[in-house]
Swiss-Prot record:
[4Fe-4S] cluster binds at residues 53, 57, 60. Transmembrane segments: none annotated. It catalyses: (4R,5S)-dethiobiotin + (sulfur carrier)-SH + 2 reduced [2Fe-2S]-[ferredoxin] + 2 S-adenosyl-L-methionine = (sulfur carrier)-H + biotin + 2 5'-deoxyadenosine + 2 L-methionine + 2 oxidized [2Fe-2S]-[ferredoxin]. Homodimer. The gene is bioB. Pfam families: BATS (PF06968), Radical_SAM (PF04055). Disulfide bonds: none annotated. Binds 1 [4Fe-4S] cluster. The cluster is coordinated with 3 cysteines and an exchangeable S-adenosyl-L-methionine. Binds 1 [2Fe-2S] cluster. The cluster is coordinated with 3 cysteines and 1 arginine. Gene3D superfamilies: Aldolase class I. This is Biotin synthase. The keyword Cell inner membrane does not apply.
Length: 346
């Protein structure tokens, strides 16, 4: 199916209903038209402010409403964040994402957030933040500081959304994405598979993303990480083929976007991850932790890359960053023996 400027639910449902191998073949063809199939973007995610979030997202251990044993932490000092960014770069990351457990940032925190963005960019890394809902002014300030990407996930379809979150409307999420666009910041937005949604809900999520005025440049597809103490802790496991199918449909619908294999990789074996890359995933988070949930260690990722013939993508902001390229090549050669710093530990 050719890429459409605007998708309908029936067209997306038709993709989900395709035989899996046919779907993977189409997704891989689309992927090769727009990307080097051997290149994978490598990002690191750091929790710069952990826990005590007032929202009620049923999947999230950072919500103050659930007893998950997570200790709340205040906003990190700027230099602490920059130190983690330096170590992330040394381990091979080219993109550094900073997440804060807020409904929305307070204006008094904006100067520190701006300094974090400026400092990380000065290291030659792409920058991304996820801070919750933004005002017009906050989005403009982050844009002026040089923020490259802003992450704000839609999570699921509009129809299923109210079963998962009640403290923030779907429209608020869409409004924040619009403000980010208007501030000149690229959009990172995706969702979660395994919330209890139907295939129609998965189609509805991707429909919302692909039909935005400009589709997100980055689309993280998460597999639910079930955390004891959250309302979704006992949800049924996601079938691996259903997850792979979602990746493939996302690739076909948003052919020029990075599709990120995000949370839940710790639960996936190498074969499942390999099929996700075949389905068009071309970005991962690198490091043992995604905010507060487990993620494969860096050396395991590099070993898998080597087995599959994949290479970390060179996307450093500073041109001619040969030192970083040498680090990555060295890491790939020595993946069996080296241990890498967990830049996302908090």
């Amino acid at each position: 199916m050719a890429h459409l400027s605007r998708w309908t639910l029936s067209q997306v449902t038709e993709l989900f209903e395709k035989p899996l191998l046919d779907l993977l073949f189409e997704a891989q063809q689309v992927h090769r038209q727009h990307f080097d199939p051997r290149q994978v973007q490598v990002s690191t995610l750091l929790s710069i402010k952990t826990g005590a979030c007032p929202e009620d997202c049923k999947y999230c251990p950072q919500s103050a409403r659930y007893k998950t044993g997570l200790e709340a932490e205040r906003l990190m000092e700027v230099e602490q964040v920059l130190d983690s960014a330096r170590k992330a770069k040394a381990a091979g990351s080219t993109r550094f994402c900073m997440g804060a457990a807020w409904k929305n940032p307070n204006d008094r925190d904006m100067p520190y957030l701006e300094q974090m963005v400026q400092g990380v960019k000065a290291l030659g890394l792409e920058t991304c933040m996820t801070l919750g809902t933004l005002s017009d002014d906050q989005a403009q300030r982050l844009g002026e500081a040089g923020l490259d990407y802003y992450n704000h996930n839609l999570d699921t379809s509009p129809e299923f959304y109210g079963n998962i979150i009640t403290t923030r409307t779907y429209q608020e999420r869409l409004d924040t994405l619009e403000k980010v666009r208007e501030a000149g910041i690229k959009v990172c937005s995706g969702g979660i598979v395994g919330l209890g949604e139907t295939v129609t809900d998965r189609a509805g999520l991707l429909l919302q993303l692909a039909n935005l005025p400009t589709p997100p440049e980055s689309v993280p597809i998460n597999m639910l990480v079930k955390v004891k103490g959250t309302p979704l802790a006992d949800n049924e496991d996601v079938d691996a083929f259903d997850f792979i199918r979602t990746i493939a449909v996302a690739r076909i619908m948003m052919p020029t976007s990075y599709v990120r294999l995000s949370a839940g990789r710790e639960q996936m074996n190498e074969q499942t991850q390999a099929m996700c890359f075949m389905a068009g995933a071309n970005s991962i988070f690198y490091g043992c932790k995604l905010l507060t949930t487990p993620n494969p260690e860096e050396d395991k990722d590099l070993q898998l890359f080597r087995k599959l013939g994949l290479n970390p993508q060179q996307t450093a902001v500073l041109a001619g960053d040969n030192e970083q390229q040498e680090r990555l090549e060295h890491a790939l050669r020595d993946a069996d023996n080296q241990q890498y710093y967990n830049a996302a530990a908090v």
